[in-house]
């Protein structure tokens, strides 16, 4: 019984040690503001193409196709 208790204690200590090293680091997120792409024309149906166009042509951080009434539009995300 003592051997079983020491194995359980060792496993618990290993779990605590592992959890201490795996703690996520918090980074202050930068707020992004969205606005419709100025270079995209037509309905947006390709997220990857929209993202590439926003990043490469408009110097945005990100881009995606979002539904904005009445159709999907390419929306670019810039730091506020």
Curated annotation (Swiss-Prot):
GO terms under cellular component: extracellular region
- Which Gene3D superfamilies does this entry report, sorted A to Z? Knottin, scorpion toxin-like
> Pfam family of this protein, just one?
Gamma-thionin
Query: Which compartment or compartments is the protein found in?
Result: Secreted
Is this entry keyworded Secreted? yes
**SUPFAM superfamilies per the UniProt record, alphabetical:** Scorpion toxin-like
Signal peptide extent: 1-29
Q: Which SMART domains match?
A: Knot1
Principal localisation: secreted
> Is Cell membrane one of the keywords?
no
Which pairs of positions does the record mark as disulfide bonds?
33-80, 44-65, 50-74, 54-76
Q: InterPro entries, per this entry?
A: Defensin_plant, Scorpion_toxin-like, Scorpion_toxin-like_sf
What keywords are assigned to this protein?
A: Antimicrobial, Disulfide bond, Fungicide, Plant defense, Pyrrolidone carboxylic acid, Secreted, Signal
Example GO BP: defense response to fungus
Which residues in this protein are found as Pyrrolidone carboxylic acid?
30
What subunit structure does UniProt give?
Forms oligomers in its native state.
The role this protein plays is: Possesses antifungal activity sensitive to inorganic cations.
Q: What protein family does this chain belong to?
A: Belongs to the DEFL family.
What name does UniProt use for this protein?
Defensin-like protein 1
| Annotated gene | AFP1
């Amino acid at each position: 019984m003592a051997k079983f208790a020491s194995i359980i204690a060792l496993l618990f200590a290993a779990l605590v040690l592992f959890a201490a090293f795996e703690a996520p680091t918090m980074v202050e997120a930068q707020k992004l503001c969205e606005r419709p792409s100025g270079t995209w024309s037509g309905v947006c149906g390709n997220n990857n193409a929209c993202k590439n166009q926003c990043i490469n042509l408009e110097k945005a951080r990100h881009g995606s196709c979002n539904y904005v009434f009445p159709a999907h539009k390419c929306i670019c995300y810039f730091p506020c």
